[in-house]
Design a protein with these regions (language model features):
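A short acidic/basic microdomain associated with nuclease active sites
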Residues: 120, 127, 131-163, 167
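Domain-level recognition of nuclease-like catalytic cores that cleave nucleotide substrates
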Residues: 201-264
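C-terminal segment of classical bacterial N-terminal signal peptides
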Residues: 25-32
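Short, charged, amphipathic alpha-helix that recurs within catalytic cores of restriction-modification
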Residues: 178, 183-214
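Bacterial N-terminal signal peptides that target proteins for export
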Residues: 2-20
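Interdomain/boundary linker segments immediately adjacent to catalytic/signaling cores
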Residues: 35-129
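Extracellular structured ligand-interaction cores
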Residues: 157-159, 170, 204-206
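Conserved catalytic cores of phosphodiester-cleaving nucleases, focusing on short active-site segments
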Residues: 160-162, 171-179
C-alpha cells in the first residue's frame, strides 16, 4: 500500500530557513510483493513536487537543529545540560566515575571484548556495562528506553535512558566508539530516524553522546580505549540525506525479469 507521510521537519525548516513550501516524503512499500500499481494523481503530484525541491534545496537540508528534529517528531524537548546546576553536577560526577570504570574494565586483558575482530561488535558490551554500573550507582536507574507501544527496544536512538531518582530528571545516552584520529571525520556516525510506534524519546530530557576513543587494534586484537567524552546534543546540528530505497523483493519481481539463467522461481 502506498502512503504519503508529511515531512516532520517541514514546519521547523520553514521557520528557520524561510522555505516557502511544505514538503512531503513519499514512501512506497511493497511488503507483499504485489504487482506495481499506477500512482494516483495526488501521489504523482507529490512526487513531481518533491524531486525538484530536493534538488534545489540541498543546502537548506543542512545545519538543522537536532533539538527541533526531536521536538517536531516526538513533541519532546531536548534540554541543555548546565554543569553548574546542582542536579546535573551530581549526576555528571556519578556518570564520570562509571565511565572511568567502564573503560578500565573493558581495557583489561580478560575483558570480553578482547579478541573481537570488529568494533561494531564491541558496542553492545559498552551499552551493557554502562547500564549495569549506572544501576549500581545510588540514586540512579538506567534501562533501555521503552517505545511508544510500551516495549523495550535496543536498536535505534537513543540506546539508554538514565533517570535521577531524586529529581526524576531524564538523561538519554547513546554510546559511540571511534578510532584515534577520526574525531574530525565527516563520515556519518550518527543517525536518527523518526518513528511513531517505535519512538523511544518519550520525555523532555538531556541528550548525551557517550564517546569512547580507541587505538587501532594491534595484531593480537587487543582493544585499548584512551578517553571518553560526554557530548551535550542540545546545540547539535544535523543534515537530512534524502534517498529512495528498494529491497531485493522490490527488484527481483517475476514480471520484471526479462532474461535469466535460472531454471525457475526459487
Amino acid at each position: 500500500m502506498n502512503a504519503i507521510f508529511r515531512w516532520p521537519f517541514a514546519r521547523s525548516l520553514s521557520r528557520v530557513r524561510g522555505i516557502g513550501m511544505t514538503a512531503s516524503v513519499i514512501a512506497f512499500s511493497n511488503v507483499n510483493a504485489q504487482p506495481a500499481t499506477v500512482p494516483s494523481s495526488t501521489e504523482k503530484a507529490a512526487v513531481d513536487a518533491l524531486i525538484p525541491w530536493l534538488l534545489q534545496e540541498d543546502a537548506q537540508l543542512r545545519g538543522i537543529p537536532f533539538s527541533e528534529v526531536i521536538f517536531d517528531s516526538t513533541g519532546k524537548h531536548v534540554l541543555a545540560c548546565n554543569p553548574k546546576d546542582e542536579t546535573n553536577a551530581r549526576v555528571l560526577k556519578q556518570m564520570s566515575s562509571v565511565l572511568d570504570e567502564v573503560m578500565a574494565r573493558l581495557n583489561a586483558p580478560e575483558s570480553p571484548i578482547q579478541g573481537i575482530p570488529r568494533i561494531n561488535e564491541v558496542s553492545s558490551h559498552f551499552e551493557d556495562l554502562i547500564r549495569e554500573l549506572l544501576n549500581k550507582t545510588p540514586g540512579l536507574a538506567c534501562d533501555f528506553p521503552k517505545t511508544a507501544t510500551g516495549g523495550k527496544q535496543r536498536s535505534g536512538y537513543p540506546d539508554l535512558e538514565l533517570v535521577d531518582q531524586l529529581s526524576h530528571r531524564v538523561y538519554y545516552l547513546d554510546p559511540k566508539l571511534y578510532a584515534v584520529g577520526s574525531r574530525d571525520s565527516s563520515f556519518r556516525t550518527f543517525y536518527f530516524e523518526p518513528k511513531i510506534a517505535t519512538n523511544k524519546v518519550r520525555e523532555d530530557a538531556v541528550h548525551f553522546i557517550v564517546g569512547f576513543e580507541h587505538e587501532k587494534p594491534a595484531a593480537d586484537r587487543q582493544w585499548k580505549f584512551t578517553r571518553w567524552d560526554l557530548v551535550d546534543l542540545s546545540h547539535f546540528q544535523v543534515k537530512l540525506k534524502a534517498e529512495f530505497q528498494g529491497s531485493n523483493r522490490d527488484m527481483y519481481r517475476p514480471e520484471a525479469i526479462v532474461a535469466t539463467s535460472g531454471k525457475g522461481p526459487e
